[in-house]
Amino acid sequence: MKTNWTIIGVIAILLATQASGFAQKTSELFIPLGQSPGLSGKHTLIGKIVQVNALNNTITMADTSGTYSVAMVPVTRIYLDKSKAGLPNSQGALADCKVGDSIEVKFVDNARSKPAEWIKVQKAP
């Protein structure tokens, strides 16, 4: 009987951790730039756009430690952070990314050598 409760407990923990990861991904649209719990500043880059290349689907960004090329793939999500303007955030596209915009980039598997999983672009009021 004790073994059954142990197995049930392990399954519950596994399901809870999977659900929280899914919840983070589905709610990321609504979290302002730089405020993603457990991600911002640790597993993301925050900086400014210095170049947008629509032909190659890349953004060049810069932060205090250097310049980075950010590759995008068809599943890369772009979120427009309009919280400073008092407007609701929305989904965006590469065309919404402008030189000088503040951005936050989360890479696939937290590896800067991989494409972006998502990009948040802060739109000024």
Predicted regions and their residues:
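Short, flexible, surface-exposed loop segments at domain boundaries
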Residues: 2-8, 13-71, 82-125
